[in-house]
């Protein structure tokens, strides 16, 4: 089976700044890949190169069987790209927006195609509502409907649920997985850890470099991080003290508990020993979270930048 995305050594520069630095990415059809990283890490630029909107300064590969450099027009016809910001017309209704997009694609029987998209995304009852009056969640549903009108084989979604309430986010992700079940490949950037865990696989980028790739469980296991959790009176108040302890990569309070992690088991023991006089606090080993791993990876990326 031909990979939906198979690119190697992607590079993009703006002046002297390299914003995407030799990124390799391979994604099989029907998979949902979460694309994570801090703001300014190169996620949007990578998505735009993959869908043919930006020309790479280096690298090669194929997208949907088309050459990344010479087949950009063919890639655009088979891919759907959803931008971070709502890009449809707020003074048009939902139906008018979708019919406009369908006509741009030159779709035959476009009214039938629009009716199907309205039904699929639960927009039929709101079809005559102005897009500008929609809440964030409904705007994202409309944007997704516009992306799938032409029957794309690949969806590139750039932080599609930013600023959307939890219920709307869950509903949106249910639709993403329904599309993947039909064989559509989805590459979606997100900052939400719960969304990352719903992906078949994850790619983490920082400062333009791909730092980790695999399932959530694989990335956690490969990180080598160790974690401990403290409970008891005053545990949460130790976060500031232990966050600066040598070897500790993260110390975060969650309610009345404290979570610390490090790649060095001995550093964890020393950190715990340094507050052993707090008799009301109990410590136990824990499993690192994706958030722990990504904070650790971002620290590594910063260290690499400092060295270079």
Question: How would you describe each model-predicted region?
Answer:
Residues 99, 103-126:
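Conserved ABC ATPase "signature" region
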Residues 91, 130-134:
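Conserved ABC ATPase signature
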Residues 59-67, 75:
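Conserved ABC transporter NBD signature motif
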Residues 155-158:
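Catalytic Walker B motif of ABC-type/P-loop ATPase nucleotide-binding domains
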Residues 174-263:
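ABC transporter nucleotide-binding domain
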Residues 51:
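Helix-to-loop junction immediately C-terminal to a conserved catalytic motif
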């Amino acid at each position: 089976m031909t990979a939906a995305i198979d690119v190697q050594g992607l590079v993009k520069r703006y002046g002297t700044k390299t914003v995407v630095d030799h990124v390799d990415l391979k994604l099989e059809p029907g998979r949902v890949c979460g694309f994570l990283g801090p703001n300014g890490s190169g996620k949007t630029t990578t998505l735009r190169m993959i869908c043919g909107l930006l020309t790479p300064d280096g690298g090669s590969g194929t997208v949907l069987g088309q050459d990344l450099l010479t087949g950009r027009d063919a890639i655009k016809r088979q891919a759907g790209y959803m931008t971070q910001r709502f890009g449809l017309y707020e003074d048009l209704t939902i139906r008018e927006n979708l019919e406009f997009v369908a006509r741009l694609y030159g779709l035959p029987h476009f009214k039938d195609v629009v009716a199907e998209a309205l039904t699929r995304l639960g927009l039929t009852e709101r079809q005559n509502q102005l897009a500008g009056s929609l809440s964030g969640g409904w705007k994202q549903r409309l944007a997704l409907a516009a992306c799938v009108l032409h029957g794309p084989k690949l969806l590139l979604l750039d932080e599609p649920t930013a600023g959307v309430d939890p219920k709307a986010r869950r509903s949106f992700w249910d639709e993403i997985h329904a599309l993947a079940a039909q064989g559509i490949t989805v590459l979606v950037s997100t900052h939400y850890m719960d969304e990352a865990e719903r992906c078949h696989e994850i790619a983490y980028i920082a400062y333009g470099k791909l730092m980790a790739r695999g399932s959530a469980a694989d990335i956690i296991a490969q990180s080598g991080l160790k974690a401990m959790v403290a409970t008891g009176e005053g545990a949460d108040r130790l976060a500031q003290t232990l966050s600066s302890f040598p070897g500790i990569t993260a110390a975060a309070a969650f309610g009345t508990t404290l979570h610390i992690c490090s790649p060095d088991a001995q550093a964890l023991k020393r950190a715990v020993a340094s507050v052993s006089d707090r008799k009301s606090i109990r410590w136990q080993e824990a499993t690192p979270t994706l958030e722990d791993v990504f904070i650790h990876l971002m620290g590594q990326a910063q260290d690499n930048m400092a060295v270079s």
